[in-house]
Amino acid sequence: CSKRNLERAAQIAASTSVRLQTVTRFDLNITSGILHTAKEYEATSIVIGLHYKTNIVDSFFGSLTENLLKTTHLEVMVARFVMPVNVLRRIIVAVPPKSEFEHGFTKWITHLCRLSGQLGCRVHFYAHPQTLGYIRGFIEKRFKDTRTAYSELEDWDDLLILTGQVNYDHLFVIVSSRRGSISYDSSFEKLPMQISKYFNNNSVMLIYPGQKDDPNENLSFADPRGWAESQYYDKAGNWIYKWFKKNS
């Protein structure tokens, strides 16, 4: 199945004259396979599809996305397209306050400006006035030919106001951030519910900007997901052990 998907991706890329290098890898799990491959090929970004929730206890993002965000400093883009990319008419971007202080701030702007140029569509940014100033300044300096629009989004809690701005043929991009980063806000925890309820029929992309320091610089095959996550397994194991001991 994975081989067929790679072949299909190569065919699609070839039809658009895009160079695509396919890689088949055997590893302990999907997360460690992606991380080791990214390190070997010196990747700067990771793009994955949005997880398809299979049951009621399954999380919105799935374990793959969650593990990647915990164990790599690279930019991670999570996408779900409900129609071919080449028919998208506009890119709507919601940006949280203080995003301009993130290490990967200019990288995701660069990605969106280039995508806008390839699709021939406008990029409309919604952000705090101060953040909008940094976005506008960078684009005017580096991508002045990009068709853009800017609107103020004073409070990130007003994100749902954009439901009336995102149409079926738009790509809705939400710039988020990892827990503990400069622009992180507790309201990000509501994103899965908001996307599922209000943007379920839209093409959506979540961007997690790259971080300066790698949380798992010493990644190894012996500990592919990092020390931080293993702590949670240890705590869970100790709790189960104590519970059984108490009730035995």
Where are these regions (language model features)?
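Juxtamembrane segments of multi-pass membrane proteins
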Residues: 1-3
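Catalytic cores of nucleotide-enabled group-transfer and carboxylate-activating enzymes in metabolic
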Residues: 7, 11-13, 40-45
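Well-ordered alpha-helical segments embedded in enzymatic catalytic cores
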Residues: 8, 33, 107-111, 158
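Short, conserved catalytic or adaptor-binding loops enriched in Gly and charged residues
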Residues: 11-15, 139-144
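Short beta-strand elements in bilobed, periplasmic/extracellular small-molecule ligand-binding domains
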Residues: 14-24, 122-123, 148-150
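Charged docking surfaces used in two-component/phosphorelay signaling
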Residues: 25-32
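Short amphipathic alpha-helix with an adjacent loop that forms part of the alpha/beta core around
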Residues: 35-38, 159-167
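Intrinsically disordered or low-complexity boundary/linker segments at protein termini
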Residues: 44-45, 50-137, 143-154, 167-171, ...
